[in-house]
């Protein structure tokens, strides 16, 4: 029987839930996600969790009591979506700050033993650091002792550099210890692009091939393919001839500045129109991982933008994980997620900390 009941706020497609769902001591009772398609994707992967597909502002105390009945929530996980901090105006800043206050409101109502609040690294410097100070002060004001740390998913077996702020609060004494890296110098080698997606068939712009080209020849692939006979969503985005020419001209790790002048795009940042490295982990992926004009996302072997399945792999979603909606929505679900392997590392340490309270 599970010892700890969990609620996931701003759940997205369930990347953070994933790690807790894999430990029998945790029982995820409910999740909240405002976007309909994303909530459907969550429910397809976590069918036993009550999904509350609504604005968090609508989660009243009465509604929560109705859903949870007499069950106590021991742990709340999640973090408001916070992309593009540098472009936020004052009104948007206020809206984002309101989401943190809603998180605090739910904590106040349910009074869990602990919470895990995750967010992008930019939150530390947003508004010259004052927003993060305010968030910490608000959580401390309702009796939580806090610890926070910047974790890079690449250090936990994810084939991608992806930094996330992990803020952990406990009522009273906080015995949470952050997971030690498992990959890096002196540890297991980082999982590279080749390790992570090299078994998926070569496809060109606009092509589909939902099969495996090789055996699962490393630990990461064995994990990704454990419950799957054939992959899905391995479709290359269709691009025009000029972009295909650009992608085919670039070598491993090169960007638009390395292109001949006659085909070099005149606009775009330095990491746009850029190939990833085959023998290194990926840079941070976003919802734009199929759009070379917006991010570094060109496949180093196949000279094309990434397929949805490849994006999911770079986030460490196993091949049986289901995404829902349009292709753009699926990329949003993947690009905004907490990598499952990172969530597993956090969940194990959270279990230890909760057990130490008993």
Residue ranges and their predicted role:
Residues 216-358:
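C-terminal target-recognition/interaction regions appended to catalytic cores
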Residues 79, 114, 305-308:
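Short aromatic/basic micro-patch
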Residues 2-111, 121-125, 130-133:
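Core alpha/beta nucleotide-donor-binding catalytic domains of modification enzymes
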Residues 1-4, 356-358:
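Short, Lys/Arg-enriched, disordered terminal segments
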Residues 31, 51-53, 146-150, 284:
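Conserved beta-strand scaffold positions in the cores of enzyme catalytic domains, especially
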Residues 62-70, 83-265:
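Class I S-adenosyl-L-methionine
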């Amino acid at each position: 029987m599970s010892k700890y009941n969990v609620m996931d706020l701003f759940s997205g497609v369930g990347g953070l839930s994933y790690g807790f769902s894999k430990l029998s001591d945790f029982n995820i009772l409910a999740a909240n996600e405002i976007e309909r398609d994303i909530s459907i994707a969550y429910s397809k992967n976590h069918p036993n969790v009550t999904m509350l597909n609504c604005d968090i502002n609508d989660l009243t105390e009465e509604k929560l009591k109705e859903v949870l009945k007499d069950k106590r929530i021991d742990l709340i996980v999640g973090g408001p979506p916070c992309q593009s901090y540098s472009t936020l105006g004052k009104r948007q800043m206020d809206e984002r700050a309101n989401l943190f206050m809603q998180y605090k409101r739910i904590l106040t109502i349910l009074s869990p033993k602990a919470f895990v609040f995750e967010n992008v690294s930019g939150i530390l410097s947003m508004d010259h650091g004052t927003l993060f100070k305010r968030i910490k002060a608000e959580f401390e004001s309702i009796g939580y002792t806090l610890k926070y740390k910047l974790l890079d998913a690449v250090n936990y077996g994810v084939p991608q550099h992806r930094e996330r702020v992990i803020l952990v609060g406990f009522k009273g004494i906080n015995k949470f210890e952050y997971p030690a890296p498992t990959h890096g110098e002196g540890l297991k080698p980082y999982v590279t692009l080749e390790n992570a997606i090299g078994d998926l068939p070569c496809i060109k712009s606009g092509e589909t091939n939902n099969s495996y080209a090789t055996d699962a020849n490393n630990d990461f692939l064995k994990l990704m393919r454990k419950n799957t006979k054939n992959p899905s969503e391995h479709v290359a985005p269709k691009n025009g001839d000029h972009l295909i020419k650009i992608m085919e001209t670039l070598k491993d790790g090169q960007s638009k500045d390395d292109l001949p002048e006659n085909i070099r795009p005149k606009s775009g940042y330095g990491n746009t129109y850029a190939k990833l490295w085959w023998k290194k982990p990926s840079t941070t992926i976003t919802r734009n991982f199929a759009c070379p004009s917006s991010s570094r996302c060109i496949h180093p072997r196949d000279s094309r933008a990434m397929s949805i399945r490849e994006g999911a792999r770079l986030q460490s979603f196993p091949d049986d994980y289901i995404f829902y909606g349009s292709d753009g929505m699926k990329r949003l679900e993947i690009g905004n997620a907490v990598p499952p392997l990172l969530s597993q590392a956090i969940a194990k340490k959270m279990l230890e900390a909760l057990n130490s309270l008993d």
